[in-house]
Amino acid sequence: SSLFKQVQNWRARVSTADFAVTNGYVYLKQPAAIVDPDLLMRTFEFVAQNGAPLAHATELHVAQVVEELAARPVKFEWWRHLSSILIRPHAALALRIMQQLGMLNVIVPEFHSIDALALRDLYHQYTVDEHTFKAIETVHKLQEAEAEWEVRFREVYEELEEPSLLFLALLMHDVGKGAPADKPHVDASLEIALERLEALGLSARETEDVYWLIEQHLEMSAVLRRDIFDAATVRAFTKRVGTPERLKMLLLLTYADIKAVNKDALTPWKAENLWQLYISAANDLNRSVDDDRFHADTDPELLRNIRLLAPQLGKRLKRFLEGMPQRYLSLHSAEEIAAHVELASKVNGN
């Protein structure tokens, strides 16, 4: 039948040198080969990409390697593989399997403290670990968005430079909820994140962005309880955010965090307010950059850096840059600026 052929074609398309999909389950072509973290993590990447769970036989092989890794931790490029899992469409399925087989605890040992942890209130529908996976799933499901308000969030997601950082922040934003009750969960999550981000092998800038997202993950929700049409409220929020990229990630983190609490948590009214706050903050960030001008006396460092690359420009460089919007300086390299100075000199005939 044509349906049988479609299934056969899908199996052939998704199968690789290492993995085969049979009856909708992932099998290892060479089970004995799964002895190192590399193939182990690629197994979860395969699940995250194709949405097929592991066959029972595969689970047994994986569990054995995970057990050995838990007993004897190894130095490994965990972030390279974890980031690849997080950005794939079925990341949440892969993460659930990783948790079930103990792999998530190998990478983030503190995750075991939120395993099946229930919050005793009427608001949270899911355990903390499942809320985390749902939040990651929520962002990925934006790819299927049809409603106009959801499409706007999807477009922001598609603009992200490094979506893996957003997903890592979501993975770790509530990990501190398993800490003693006398410590605020954000503080506990930050302590854990600081240690884990370094162990995962993130760069200093990546660590800073993920840490900031975890630290501020309740901020947008807090601002929504104020007057979001008040310019001073928006300006104070914008100052804390700092960059358009962080604003985009915080918007999506907040959207996913609220939506993954329970099926009715993100009402259309709340989603609209969240979007309005984002637009106001984005406009404020753009205005701030346009209003901010370069002055040689207050920023001599930049002048020196460009002069090192193009000493022939002399005083023309200072004249050209004086009063330029800071946005221009952030968009162009020193080489491009030097070329623009030369072009302006030709146009002006000097």
Outline where the language-model segments fall.
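Divalent metal-dependent catalytic cores for phosphoryl transfer on phosphate-bearing substrates
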Residues: 1, 127-128, 154-288
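Active-site-adjacent "gating/activation" loops or surface patches in catalytic cores
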Residues: 6-26, 100-120, 127-175, 180
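Short helix-capping/linker segments at secondary-structure and domain boundaries
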Residues: 47-57, 105-106, 143-147, 176-180, ...
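Regulatory modules associated with amino-acid/nitrogen control
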Residues: 1-25, 233-350
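Flexible, glycine/threonine-enriched loop-and-boundary segments that flank and lead into catalytic domains
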Residues: 117-121, 144-159, 194-195, 231-237, ...
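Non-catalytic interface/linker regions that flank or bridge core catalytic/transmembrane domains
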Residues: 1-122
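Short, hydrophobic/amphipathic alpha-helical patches that form generic packing surfaces
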Residues: 37-50, 84, 97-100, 137, ...
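Short coil/turn segments at secondary-structure boundaries
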Residues: 1-3, 54-62, 74-79, 93-102, ...
